[in-house]
Each structure stands twice: as structure tokens, then as C-alpha cells.
């Protein structure tokens, strides 16, 4: 899953807190271009730095992030603990595997990743 701590999260100094949970922005959000909030979203995302990363884990990343609307997020999730507004929910996570691949390709080059195969994974997951 592609992860980006949004400008409000960076400005609030929450990069470290989020880490404890172990191409241009217009192109990134191109699938939302027909939505009424698109221009405002692009302006907001360009208003400051973002901290981009890639997380991997079966069924855990979305649970750690919480729901898009912080009001629907459980305590113990990033959005449940640090957010109150859907428009400023501090973190982005890809909604599908296909979008994750596209978003990761916008932000990173393939050679920036290290292949890592955890041997115990076969014992934990079928």
C-alpha cells in the first residue's frame, strides 16, 4: 500500500507518531478530477511537504490507518487517534492493489526497493 502523511500531519509533527505504527499530486489524484473537491484537494496537497512510504502487510495496513472518515475510525488507529475531520485526515492509503501499484510507480523507482522474503510468512499465512 502506498502511504503519504499529508501536510497537516507533517505540520503537526506526527510523522514519528505514524511511524510507530510501523509524480505530481494532480496526477496522483487524477481519478478524482471530476469531483467538486478536486481543485481544493490538489491545492491542499501542494501546500507543504508530504512524507511518502510503502507499507506491506496482509489485512493490517487499512486497520492501522483507520477509515477515511476519522469519525468512523476505531481508537488505536492513526485516524482514530489523531484526526477529527475527513478533509484533514493526515494520511493517505491506497484503496486497491491496482491503485497502490500506480501510486507507488508515481512516487518511487523500482530500484529504490529491496526484495525481502520473510521465511516465517509461510508458517503464519496460508
Curated annotation (Swiss-Prot):
Residue ranges the record marks as coiled coil: none
Acyltransferase keyword on record: no
Protein keywords: ATP-binding, Cell cycle, Cell projection, Cytoplasm, Kinase, Magnesium, Metal-binding, Nucleotide metabolism, Nucleotide-binding, Nucleus, Phosphoprotein, Transferase
Compartments reported by the entry: Cytoplasm; Nucleus; Cell projection, Lamellipodium; Cell projection, Ruffle
Biological process, per Gene Ontology: CTP biosynthetic process; GTP biosynthetic process; UTP biosynthetic process
UniProt key word Signal: no
Molecular function GO terms recorded: ATP binding; metal ion binding; nucleoside diphosphate kinase activity
GO CC aspect terms: cytoplasm; lamellipodium; nucleus; ruffle
InterPro entries: NDK-like_dom, NDK-like_dom_sf, Nucleoside_diP_kinase
Classification via SMART domains: NDK
Protein origin, superkingdom: Eukaryota
Catalytic activity, reaction form: a 2'-deoxyribonucleoside 5'-diphosphate + ATP = a 2'-deoxyribonucleoside 5'-triphosphate + ADP; a ribonucleoside 5'-diphosphate + ATP = a ribonucleoside 5'-triphosphate + ADP
Residues at the active site: 92
Cofactor field: Mg(2+)
UniProt-listed Enzyme Commission number(s): 2.7.4.6
Residues at which ATP binds: 6, 37, 68, 79, 89
Similarity section: Belongs to the NDK family.
Protein purpose: Major role in the synthesis of nucleoside triphosphates other than ATP.
Protein name per Swiss-Prot or TrEMBL: Nucleoside diphosphate kinase B
Organism listed in the record: Macruronus novaezelandiae (Blue grenadier)
Lineage, highest ranks first: Eukaryota, Metazoa, Chordata, Craniata, Vertebrata
GN (gene name): nme2
Amino acid at each position: 500500500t502506498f502511504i503519504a502523511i499529508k501536510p497537516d500531519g507533517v505540520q503537526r509533527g506526527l510523522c514519528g507518531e505514524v511511524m510507530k505504527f510501523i509524480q505530481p499530486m494532480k496526477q496522483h489524484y487524477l481519478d478524482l478530477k471530476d469531483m467538486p473537491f478536486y481543485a481544493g484537494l490538489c491545492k491542499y496537497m501542494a501546500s507543504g511537504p508530504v512524507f511518502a512510504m510503502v507499507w506491506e502487510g496482509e489485512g493490517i495496513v487499512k486497520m492501522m490507518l483507520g477509515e477515511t472518515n476519522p469519525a468512523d475510525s476505531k481508537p488505536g488507529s492513526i485516524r482514530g487517534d489523531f484526526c477529527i475531520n475527513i478533509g484533514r485526515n493526515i494520511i493517505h492509503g491506497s484503496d486497491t492493489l491496482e491503485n497502490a501499484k500506480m501510486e507507488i510507480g508515481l512516487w518511487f523507482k523500482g530500484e529504490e526497493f529491496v526484495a525481502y522474503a520473510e521465511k516465517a510468512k509461510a508458517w503464519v499465512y496460508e
